[in-house]
């Protein structure tokens, strides 16, 4: 893809002082990176620049000296600090012209929303001479595709993620497919694992990590481990076939450690199992404080399975709502397997659910002891075939939020394994001892 001057690849320039200050997360950069990979476009660099005209001009010129294509996000609005179009034109000493068709579109969209466009909005109709409009189907700020030189093209998009994505799918993606810049079609899939560390998993699949097409790359996140498979081929079916083959190999090596792919969360997988079985779930939480319920209710359609939950922080609530005997709390303490079991059985009885999960532990930073340190969590799974509880010990150094997050994930994974065992005819004791 390199030209005679050595320019190659695509760069992304995200514009906005709010990005530099960390006021908002730069989700556009990640999304664009995935889209570029899917189109088989070599993507070498991402840059963030604030709302400063001189720095924008300098950055655009530098990118033009080394890359074939620049994609920008942000800075297309009507306010004085929206400088993207102006700076790009200035970088190539090209005048701006008001586009009557763009202004007519802005005016029509504004009026359809019950307002007249203000005079400041008129700057959104200015484009460099020779630029082609990239229509914005959902907002008023149009983008552009412009080749100021024979070997460099810039595409601009608004910073609002929904507008940027709609414009990309409608206009930019087709443009790239026809541009001849692609080096093939890339397909990626991410397998998700629970119950194994990143280094251990990497060692099990070391030979696959060393292959080149598809590539397999490990990374950890939110208590789980992920393996991203990426294949390149001349067309999508061929690339998909390569990914499918590697996925089958990985799943055969790792068994039920792999709980899903791509956007499938532990919660969504568990809910899908229960929905298919026509069964219901309830939760009782102490140390996670509703975090488990939040994971479940984040999944669309969870109301078909999840009946409800109880946050039983105080011992009195454990007794009064869940029926945990006060004598049991006095004998073994709230952070124990017997209490976790009593909580699970209590919420199952209270709601009439088929299955129940319960967690009680010490999330920290205080409250631990030598016998029951910070990071100790007891997790119970109750179902038609009985109730079991086992503890986990998590690193206190990881912090309270991490302990709560991983505890909720571990509870979901234990239920997943119990359901898989039930479906295969395995006993629940065998599943809990997995």
From Swiss-Prot:
Transmembrane segments: none annotated. Pfam families: CinA, CinA_KH, MoCF_biosynth. It comes from the Bacteria. Disulfide bonds: none annotated. Belongs to the CinA family. HAMAP family: CinA_B. This is CinA-like protein.
């Amino acid at each position: 893809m390199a030209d005679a001057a050595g320019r190659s690849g695509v760069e992304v320039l995200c514009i906005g002082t709010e990005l530099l200050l960390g006021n908002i997360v730069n989700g556009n950069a990640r999304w664009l990176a995935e889209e570029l990979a899917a189109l088989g476009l070599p993507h070498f660099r991402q840059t963030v620049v604030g709302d400063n005209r001189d720095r924008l001009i300098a950055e655009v010129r530098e990118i033009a000296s080394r890359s074939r294509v620049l994609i920008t996000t942000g800075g297309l609005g009507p306010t004085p600090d929206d400088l993207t179009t102006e700076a790009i034109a200035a970088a190539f000493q090209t005048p701006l012209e008001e586009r009557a068709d763009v202004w007519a579109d802005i005016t029509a969209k504004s009026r359809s929303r019950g307002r007249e466009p203000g005079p400041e909005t008129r700057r959104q109709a200015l484009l460099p001479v020779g630029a082609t409009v990239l229509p914005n189907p959902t907002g008023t700020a149009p983008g552009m595709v412009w080749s100021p030189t024979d070997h460099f093209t810039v595409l601009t998009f608004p910073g609002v993620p929904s507008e940027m994505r709609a414009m990309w799918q409608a206009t930019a993606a087709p443009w790239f497919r026809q541009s001849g810049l692609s080096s093939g079609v890339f397909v990626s899939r991410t397998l998700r694992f629970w119950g194994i560390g990143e280094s251990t998993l990497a060692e099990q699949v070391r030979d696959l990590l060393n292959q080149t097409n598809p590539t397999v790359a490990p990374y950890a996140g939110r208590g789980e481990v992920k393996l991203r498979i990426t294949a390149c081929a001349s067309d999508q079916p061929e690339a998909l076939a390569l990914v499918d083959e590697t996925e089958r190999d990985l799943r055969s090596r790792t068994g039920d450690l792999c709980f899903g792919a791509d956007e499938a969360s532990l919660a969504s997988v568990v809910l899908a199992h229960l929905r298919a079985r026509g069964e219901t779930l309830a939760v009782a939480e102490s140390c996670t404080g509703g975090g488990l319920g939040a994971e479940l209710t984040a999944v669309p359609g969870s109301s078909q399975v999840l009946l409800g939950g109880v946050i039983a922080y105080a011992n009195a609530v454990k007794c009064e709502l869940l029926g945990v005997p006060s004598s049991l709390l006095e004998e073994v303490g709230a952070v124990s397997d017997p209490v976790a079991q009593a909580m699970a059985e209590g919420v199952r009885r209270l709601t009439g659910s088929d299955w129940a999960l319960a967690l009680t532990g010490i999330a920290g930073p205080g409250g631990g002891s030598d016998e029951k340190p910070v990071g100790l969590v007891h997790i119970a799974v109750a179902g038609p075939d009985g109730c079991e509880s086992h503890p986990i010990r998590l690193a206190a150094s990881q912090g309270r939020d991490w302990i709560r997050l991983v505890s909720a994930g571990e509870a979901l994974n234990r239920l997943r394994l119990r359901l898989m065992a039930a479906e295969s005819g395995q006993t629940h004791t065998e599943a809990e001892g997995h």
